[in-house]
């Protein structure tokens, strides 16, 4: 099968999807990257990822979304994939209280393994199943505020707030990267006789200016 060559992009941002098994992470991934939803989707084994290129404030950003398995037996495998992530979408199922109760455990794991500046959004998924709701939107919002996270309720089935969730994460990441670049430029300009360009992009958010094959 021939490789598809992506269009040129300015930034590559790695984002991880985390949360319990069965909360809808894989369908969030497929809805965002392929605009697809599979009613018969099975639990992810190990890790898979997909990409999508989009515009963020005039820059072309390639989002590399990693879908990490929620099952306990795979947590040791997936922890390695937090490395290099600059964003995370922490997902729970609004119809299953236990998945919401486990959010703080996932947050601890994320903060133990990921960069301290990682951008995190919490998503209460399956908002289309309001008649089965076990977690109120107010409870979700309150926990997000307590932990300093952005928050949305989403539906991969009905494509509600999926786009907004990722756009919010990517825009916030871009703002952080831009501020770092500006600060580095200002620091460099204050050094007389220094003509060296400072590269502030790290391995997880490299500024790219060439085509690449996937």
From Swiss-Prot:
GO terms for molecular function: GTP binding; GTPase activity. A motif (Effector region) lies at residues 41-49. It holds the Pfam family Ras. The keyword Cell membrane applies. Keywords: Cell membrane, GTP-binding, Lipoprotein, Membrane, Nucleotide-binding, Prenylation. It is a lipid-anchor. GTP binds at residues 19-26, 67-71, 125-128. Its main location: membrane. A lipid is attached at residues 211-212 (S-geranylgeranyl cysteine). GO terms for cellular component: plasma membrane. It is found in: Cell membrane. It comes from the Eukaryota. PROSITE patterns: RAB (PS51419). Belongs to the small GTPase superfamily. Rab family. This is Ras-related protein Rab2BV. It comes from Beta vulgaris (Sugar beet). The gene is RAB2BV.
